[in-house]
Amino acid sequence: MDKPHTQIMSIWLIVSTLLLLLMIVVGGITRLTNAGLSIVEWNPVSGIIPPISSEDWNNEFNKYTASPEFKLINNQITISEFKYIFFIEYIHRLLGRITGIIIIIPFLIFCYLKSLTKLQYYRLLLITCLVVIQGFMGWYMVKSGLKETPYINHCRLAGHLLLAVIIYHQLIAELLIIIQPFKCYTLATSKANNSNSTSINVINLKIKLIIFNKIIIFLLYTQIMFGALVAGLDAGLIYNEFPNMGDSLIPIEILNQSIDFTMFDNQVLMQFIHRWFGILISGLIICYAIWLIILNKHALRGMGMVAACLVLVQVTTGIITLLYHVPILAALTHQVGAILILTTFLFIQNIVTNFELLH
């Protein structure tokens, strides 16, 4: 790919990544304000135009009054209050459409111009397919709350968030491949140290760093999933204390019952797992960050410091979110913090993967 195409693709991927990050934030706001069920239809094309006239608003409000959420929860809501939650969900859906267009249309143009390598084509095709699936996944999630029970299925919510994170991950990975910010980064300190034994040690170190980093990325995905389950179950609104859950570190509900296949529906268990799994991952990240700092290689040292700082902030925002009964700002900061930590480790993965050994 020539330089102009590389620059254009880099800008496209950066814009797509930022839009997706914004989508995740707005999705969090939608969940925290309970606005997700305010639009009871899915019209990918006609739904782009919002209600404008009083008649339009009355039509939308009448549709909402027929929904289980209105009948069982929000039957006192006014049309002014309805407009507020409607616009939050509308913005989320509109942003989803814009993000989809921004990702899909340029991809088709690049294909038409035949400016993609074979590997790029397949990687970007995967991203495009995931974006389309995400649109259907969003409606599949919302649809779960339009039945008798007016609550969005928490497992579908977790799937929707995880799919967004996977797309974000793939966009970041593709961007790093194109711009190659750490290409030819040298792990070895100098040519004088390039004996065979030193080269072997460096290779072993590189393998260890890659493996450990991938483990942390996997654990982060798992923790994000548990966070989504906690959000979907409103499990952050119980046991608003730390470190204890009631009279002990382990809540009595867990001590008095066996774990079965309904564990993902259990508010207490999900909060317990999310808080202590988070502490475990935070400890691993701090240890890994210290390791990177001790290696004293400029890019790794900097990333290690960033990772350590982010995880300390993340633990703090998590505790604040819990203690203060899930305030929107703290909860959003906590959600974005998880994405930023994941991003940091995607950058670290790129660094350690692109080490060039001196011979």
UniProtKB/Swiss-Prot annotation:
The subunit structure is: Interacts with CtaB.
Give, as one word, the top-level EC class: oxidoreductase
Q: Which HAMAP family match?
A: HemeA_synth_type2
EC number(s) stated in the UniProt entry for this protein: 1.17.99.9
What is the phylogenetic placement of the source species in the record?
Answer: Bacteria, Pseudomonadati, Pseudomonadota, Alphaproteobacteria, Rickettsiales
The protein's matches in InterPro entries, at most eight in alphabetical order, are given as:
COX15/CtaA_fam, HemeA_Synthase_type2
The similarity comment for this entry is: Belongs to the COX15/CtaA family. Type 2 subfamily.
Establish whether keyword Cell membrane is in the entry: yes
Asked if the record carries the keyword Transmembrane, the reply is: yes
- Look up and give the organism this protein is from: Orientia tsutsugamushi (strain Boryong) (Rickettsia tsutsugamushi)
Entries under Pfam families matching the protein: COX15-CtaA
Q: Give UniProt keywords alphabetically.
A: Cell membrane, Heme biosynthesis, Iron, Membrane, Metal-binding, Oxidoreductase, Transmembrane, Transmembrane helix
For the ligand (heme), the binding residues are 274, 334
Question: What pathway annotation does it carry?
Answer: Porphyrin-containing compound metabolism; heme A biosynthesis; heme A from heme O: step 1/1
Which cofactor(s) are needed, names only?
heme b
| Molecular function terms from GO | metal ion binding; oxidoreductase activity, acting on NAD(P)H, heme protein as acceptor
Q: What is known about what this protein does? A: Catalyzes the conversion of heme O to heme A by two successive hydroxylations of the methyl group at C8. The first hydroxylation forms heme I, the second hydroxylation results in an unstable dihydroxymethyl group, which spontaneously dehydrates, resulting in the formyl group of heme A.
**Can you cite an annotated GO cellular component?**
plasma membrane
Task: Give the protein name, as stated in the record.
Answer: Heme A synthase
Q: Which GO terms describe its biological process?
A: heme A biosynthetic process
Topology versus the membrane: Multi-pass membrane protein
Transmembrane ranges, per UniProt, are 8-28, 94-114, 124-144, 159-179, 215-235, 276-296, 303-323, 328-348
Q: What is its main location?
A: membrane
Cellular compartments annotated: Cell membrane
Q: What catalytic activity does the UniProt entry give for this protein? A: Fe(II)-heme o + 2 A + H2O = Fe(II)-heme a + 2 AH2
